[in-house]
Amino acid sequence: MWKRSEQMKIKSGKCNMAAAMETEQLGVEIFETADCEENIESQDRPKLEPFYVERYSWSQLKKLLADTRKYHGYMMAKAPHDFMFVKRNDPDGPHSDRIYYLAMSGENRENTLFYSEIPKTINRAAVLMLSWKPLLDLFQATLDYGMYSREEELLRERKRIGTVGIASYDYHQGSGTFLFQAGSGIYHVKDGGPQGFTQQPLRPNLVETSCPNIRMDPKLCPADPDWIAFIHSNDIWISNIVTREERRLTYVHNELANMEEDARSAGVATFVLQEEFDRYSGYWWCPKAETTPSGGKILRILYEENDESEVEIIHVTSPMLETRRADSFRYPKTGTANPKVTFKMSEIMIDAEGRIIDVIDKELIQPFEILFEGVEYIARAGWTPEGKYAWSILLDRSQTRLQIVLISPELFIPVEDDVMERQRLIESVPDSVTPLIIYEETTDIWINIHDIFHVFPQSHEEEIEFIFASECKTGFRHLYKITSILKESKYKRSSGGLPAPSDFKCPIKEEIAITSGEWEVLGRHGSNIQVDEVRRLVYFEGTKDSPLEHHLYVVSYVNPGEVTRLTDRGYSHSCCISQHCDFFISKYSNQKNPHCVSLYKLSSPEDDPTCKTKEFWATILDSAGPLPDYTPPEIFSFESTTGFTLYGMLYKPHDLQPGKKYPTVLFIYGGPQVQLVNNRFKGVKYFRLNTLASLGYVVVVIDNRGSCHRGLKFEGAFKYKMGQIEIDDQVEGLQYLASRYDFIDLDRVGIHGWSYGGYLSLMALMQRSDIFRVAIAGAPVTLWIFYDTGYTERYMGHPDQNEQGYYLGSVAMQAEKFPSEPNRLLLLHGFLDENVHFAHTSILLSFLVRAGKPYDLQIYPQERHSIRVPESGEHYELHLLHYLQENLGSRIAALKVI
């Protein structure tokens, strides 16, 4: 028998029952707390009768789900994305630009390339809707589901790609060359370059190859778009799309059947860099070619080489793998060895006719660990605009120290086995050639890697200017324009000895704060800056007006003043700015309205080019309008006892009856780098929450301390103590809502989440079984020492230095604290999960069995960390609804408690 172990107290002490107020600051309806101090005890209220959800059979639930999801498929992936602006340069033509983008084709539901024309003038009395025109003729771009190669499957997991077709493309402005991967091939077409603009769909050209396996990560050479590079079997290859010449550049991987004997890769981002740092490539073309006296050129590629011989191999065995009876992965668990990494460079000598003369593989003049002492992760890399230096953003293992370094190509020498010849090559490099650390920062919390780094063309040989974003200075990510002096190192390689940590550091000449305040500049998941070097402006996305809305802003980076917002409040925006900074596209939505995509023209007075204003120009995708049978949630906030304002969403039951109290489901993520509560449309990704509300559940979502977009102090609250604070915030939010709404039944609360949300669902049942009746945990971490280095050590530190934190944060170690009543715990997990391995669930089950605790389990044999197979997704939602119905919401669930 399950009983409430104690009468719940209302910790937040708030009793304002006023109607919703629209706050001027946020531009979105938010139900706020009041200043009243009395607690509202449950016995002070009239006795309410419980509302029981209708009990459906499995087949009835299946039909109900099908009916509620009929608009869902239409909305998924409908919005265009990955925009590219190209000037038409036609003085007499009606169009100024052509924009290219990826979107879903109506014919075969695949992502493919489209374009639209931007008119030079518009009729302001009417709304112009741009027509979508297919750039490509129809061709088979996608294999049948389940036919992706292992490499493609894993990359799609890391990038969270759920659509089919073309996932991304590369474009070269000068030649008009498009390059993209589709199905098992790499293709190219030309449009918008010297040959003009097509009016008919183009037939893609297959890049022919001798490679027997899948080719990944194709990129155009920016210095010569006839050449492309790609990854084949963990090595770098190049190919000429005109002459069809193909060459393998690196030979580090041997394609051996035994993974233990074949641990090296070139040009490939390893698992942790992809999953935890959002870096998916491991090679970078130099933007400029070096000309040779004979009329040829030298092309360069900087790449990383990884040695994973000391990284543990994880084996996943399943009959569902069909031809592969076992899948094996290199997976560095926290506290164990990461891959050994170094930079190398490939130089390709091209003759005047465009043929390869020679390829030289080069390595650093000294070992990576000597030149870059204490560096564990290559977080980002690239080249300066002139190609004079490669640059890289480097992190130490604890992720509390960041360095930006410049690396001259002169720092690399040809790979040479002969010791004497190698020494001669080393001595030929001047002592003045060393790495240059142009920026360094440290923190006692952690450093969140982002994509904001803009290097200006060098105007002085001895200086370099760049824009970077930092959280370490104020606790909020802001933009800084930094000038570093490229000072020659005092370390002399020829004199022997090792460099000191400070030998390569360059002094900072000037550092200008471009933005400031208790809000953040966005720099991940597609958000980046656009720099207008002509007008000396920087465009960025941020949360200046509200932590719940993303907006586009502009400010001068030379004389920073007031930041100008360019997008409309009341919506959350994701923007793309043209290369000439004369147009921008915004994809925007709010809680009530599905996403819409619009084009805006930017202009400024002639006497003040820094004063930017926008003008609506055209619609690219109109909003679908309110969805039938969809009721958006209400956003609320409350002042937590921790001193922070916490935000949440409340889905009320659709047929709310007075005098009734309703079963409540807390949907949770609660981990870092995610924000669930914001002013965006939730009717697509989180449609199941609306379904629950339609069945008679109250649904609550709360962003606790540790979630993103609230500053480093807010996010860093669970440093060293994951799992120890999040449920306190969630419970306080539930208690606050119960103090405002008597229809919330705190005797019938369930919790559900996936990944970190699954982990916290377990924590909730373990820590507060007096509050949570049912927990449904999907793909949960149960033992932190089983999770990867990059994520776990960032937040929890090294396990040897935080044993108590790892113990308290691991539910498997505390299985005896779970309730002893059946029908309260359901675990869901994909058997092929390569991120949070199924071992997390199996070890928890072992400890639950030892402790004599009941549980229910649902395995998805074909799924990895994300559910991809449509039938699996439907089954998961059915199981979720059925379990909640049988064990929380229905009358039969109440009888089980008695």
UniProtKB/Swiss-Prot annotation:
Belongs to the peptidase S9B family. DPPIV subfamily. This is Dipeptidyl peptidase 8. The keyword Protease applies. The lineage of its organism: Eukaryota, Metazoa, Chordata, Craniata, Vertebrata. GO terms for molecular function: aminopeptidase activity; dipeptidyl-peptidase activity; serine-type peptidase activity. Changing D451F: Reduced dimerization and reduced enzyme activity. Its EC number is 3.4.14.5. Keywords: Aminopeptidase, Apoptosis, Cytoplasm, Hydrolase, Protease, Serine protease. It comes from Homo sapiens (Human). The gene is DPP8. Homodimer. Forms a ternary complex with NLRP1, composed of a DPP8 homodimer, one full-length NLRP1 protein, and one cleaved C-terminus of NLRP1 (NACHT, LRR and PYD domains-containing protein 1, C-terminus). Forms a ternary complex with CARD8, composed of a DPP8 homodimer, one full-length NLRP1 protein, and one cleaved C-terminus of CARD8 (Caspase recruitment domain-containing protein 8, C-terminus). In the ternary complex, only one subunit of the DPP8 homodimer is bound to NLRP1 or CARD8.
